[in-house]
Amino acid sequence: MKPEELEDMTTLTIKTNALDNNIRIIKRLANGAKVIAVLKGNAYGLGLTKFASFLQSKGIDNYGVTELSDAVTLRRNGITGNILLMTPLYNSEDITTAIDHDITLSITSTDCAHVIDETAAYMNHPTVHAHLCIDTGFGRYGFLCSEEKQIADTVQSLRHVRITGIFSHFHAAACRNEYYVKKQFQDFTHLCDTPVSYTHLRAHETELHL
């Protein structure tokens, strides 16, 4: 059998009734908190636009992606809820594209914040929504928990950006390191006195196991 014929035999079957049940369980565990569906990596192989449309039909209206192209694709395919780009943008052209498609941006540093603010000013855009990203141990990007003054000074300097959320990512949730996860949680909540619409930290592993 030829390799291309083997590829044609690969099929992914998704049972929507099982997905529906999983959504209900997660909503129940969230205990009234909003659920953000993170759809990176082609929705973890489930198909970005089809899966997002299914989630939207089930009342999910918050989405997280790690690629600007995915955020734009969701908008162009009828996803009307909040879309958060969870990785930083430093290029004015990319930021302009995100603003044009009503994408919520992530601010991971003072430089990142200023580029977004300057781009919005150039576009004469009154308010761009953004979430602050805090590094509680993941080590990729984000303000450190010890940088409270820098965070405050950065936020106060913004004229065209409205901070609507603050988030971080559990570093060791999957391995169930309960002590370390709780330490991350404490470090994060220490910075969450700012009144914002969304404060999000949990991943599905912590929701199910902690």
Residue ranges and their predicted role:
Residues 3-6, 10-13, 18-21, 33-198:
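Active-site-proximal beta-alpha core segment in soluble small-molecule metabolic enzymes
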Residues 26-32:
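Glycine-rich phosphate/diphosphate-binding loops that line cofactor/substrate pockets in enzymes
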Residues 74, 208-210:
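Generic leucine side-chain signal with a strong bias for well-ordered alpha-helical environments
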Residues 199-208:
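Conserved small/polar residues in nucleotide/adenosyl-binding loops
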